[in-house]
């Protein structure tokens, strides 16, 4: 019987979400399809799995949040083949956003990409609130300043 509830409402209930995941895993297992089930937040597992797969083939990751994009940019390395991130959300009257992770890393440089998790947590992510009045664009421009870079290095070395 089809579920007539909106996806967001259904998945907002943790019991429903876990039951759906369990059923999906059972079905995938029936067809010998490999899967990974994240215990906590799935973003890091998705990014690490994409990097592992990208060592032998091109990878397309479809996701809905900036956390995943930041983790991909941070973790993809030179040994990886092409990694593409496609947003599954389309803004009204706008095109779907698609990022080539290697080109994005090339544009921003390794130093900035290494510090992106620091910048992202400072400006708001799934697990932290953003500081009032500091957007991601402004913070990214300021990341070239030595003081902010030093704070970012300290943050990244202690996590």
What residue ranges belong to the model's regions?
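Noncatalytic, typically N-terminal accessory segments of nucleic acid-processing enzymes
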Residues: 1-159
């Amino acid at each position: 019987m089809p579920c007539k509830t909106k996806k967001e409402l259904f998945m907002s209930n943790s019991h429903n979400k876990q039951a759906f995941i369990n059923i999906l895993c059972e079905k995938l297992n029936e067809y010998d399809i490999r899967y990974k089930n994240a215990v906590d937040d799935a973003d890091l597992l998705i990014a690490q799995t994409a990097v592992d797969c990208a060592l032998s083939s091109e990878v397309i990751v479809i996701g809905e949040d900036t956390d995943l994009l930041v983790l991909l940019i941070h973790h993809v390395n030179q040994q990886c083949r092409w990694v593409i991130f496609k947003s599954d959300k389309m803004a009204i009257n706008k095109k779907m956003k698609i990022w080539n992770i290697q080109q994005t890393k090339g544009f921003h440089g390794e130093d900035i990409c290494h510090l992106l998790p620091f910048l992202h947590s400072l400006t708001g992510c799934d697990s932290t609130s953003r500081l009032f009045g500091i957007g991601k664009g402004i913070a990214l421009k300021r990341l070239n300043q030595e003081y902010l870079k030093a704070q970012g290095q300290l943050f990244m070395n202690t996590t």
